[in-house]
Curated annotation (Swiss-Prot):
Molecular function, one GO term: protein folding chaperone
Family to which the UniProt record says this protein belongs: Belongs to the complex I LYR family.
Annotated source species: Danio rerio
Signal peptide positions (record): none
Alphabetical list of Pfam families matching this protein: Complex1_LYR (PF05347)
Chaperone keyword on record: yes
Protein name: Complex III assembly factor LYRM7
Subunit note: Interacts with UQCRFS1.
GO biological process terms, semicolon-separated: mitochondrial respiratory chain complex III assembly
Localization, UniProt: Mitochondrion matrix
GO cellular component: mitochondrial matrix
InterPro entries reported in the protein's UniProt record: Complex1_LYR_dom, Complex1_LYR_LYRM7, MZM1/LYRM7
Amino acid sequence: MGTRLKVLRVFKDLHRTRRDVFRDDNRALTAARVKINEEFKKNKNETSDDNIKEMLKMARAVETILRESVIQAEHVDENKIVLRPRKSLLLENVPYCDAPSKKT
């Protein structure tokens, strides 16, 4: 696959992830869109294959972090926050046990 297609694919993947991660949060959606577009425009004239590969690697890492680590939270009261995790984050969730297990 050509470099141009790889860049376009990463660009689209970042925007898809942005839409999924920040669903129903217009402020975060807009800020993420602006930042993604700004970074890609800033580097659109890059010609070095090594630099492009490094930037693609970084963009993939950012996309992975957004997809796997970011969770939405909303203040609903002075001392209350509602978390809205995506289903993909809960698949590998293991309940925390506060009591240590006894060894026999």
